[in-house]
């Protein structure tokens, strides 16, 4: 969790922040949008991309690259085709319209993901030291603004929906899926970065899970201050929304901004210029309570600290036990596998079968749905490397980015499998010519109330921690996604997806995948 390059501790801000030299920092993070993508693949995946990018530019960083890690069920199943088309199109449409290149990722198939696919999105951005913005609320009397899209009823109970198993009637939760607008997000990005340059911002927070109630509590708890919010001032796109709906709506492309008192006009002018709704809905107050009013009537009053991690929110110590299948795997003897002869007649069908397998064949169809050239910074368009290299125009260096996890390895041995995921990401970074710096992770597991699933979770974290210490790549933050299972097919394979950041100081040291000339030696 700590390292020489770390500019923010894990979980301290909306995303990890790592020093890349020359007065610049990289903000990067990976998150999941699994449950929404399972029932509405297009919007579920699209809003996952939007959410992770807002986490980056909320800190004052301009996103320059996106990656994703996708897992689906049986490749030949019609539902897999439907899910895959929708998810890939959602990622592509949102990312392409938003104007950020998708530079890498992975696609994996296994029967266990048939009902519950995994959709993990990663984003990285660049910001100058001293120009970052904290997700904090402080200074009694300072105004609180809601900016971005108007609030609707989409996404209400979205956080609760993501915290339960997918049942046979999961389609009934469709209203819990948010609806995205990448063009609005592009405007919000430019307006936000312009506003930060005015110096009028005290703190800023993306509105994600649980909407207003979550963003106000997180900012207030961090600043040890309260807020008084007038919910009737929230711009809406549906008439007669009730107070609890306004509090819990997860409508996309929205931010909460706390500004310095007396500089309200600067905030309003910037967002008016970009034609983005902006409304003062409250102010910072003394004490540590959140007060929510609807037409002057107090409808909720709660200590902000009671709702956040590290405060009054409960921390559970769960029982866990090793699954029976672990001993079955340990008893397996590889020597029992019949080794084929080295004859061409016997080897060729095996090679053809392997090269045609969905997990080994080309994923070009997926990659071609994403724009990887926009921004003119992706260095792997014509000369790919094991990691994705993205040119940092401000200092002439390059970021190296990779997302990795072999779910089957983690299923067979969570400790070793998670360590292998970190090692694979580090190898990809090194093989591109860069030095590994730091990690973000997305931990996708089943129901934590299942002792065997929780055992997988504990062991995977231990293995990941061991590997990160060995490679000196601190974990900057990330996301834990539980309940990835159906009520009738059981949990998915444990999938701790590793997003790793590296730095290439000298572009002439870039390493690419292609053979260079005849006569060069090949080593294994």
Language-model features and meaning:
Residues 1-524:
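Glycine/proline-enriched, intrinsically flexible loops and inter-domain linkers
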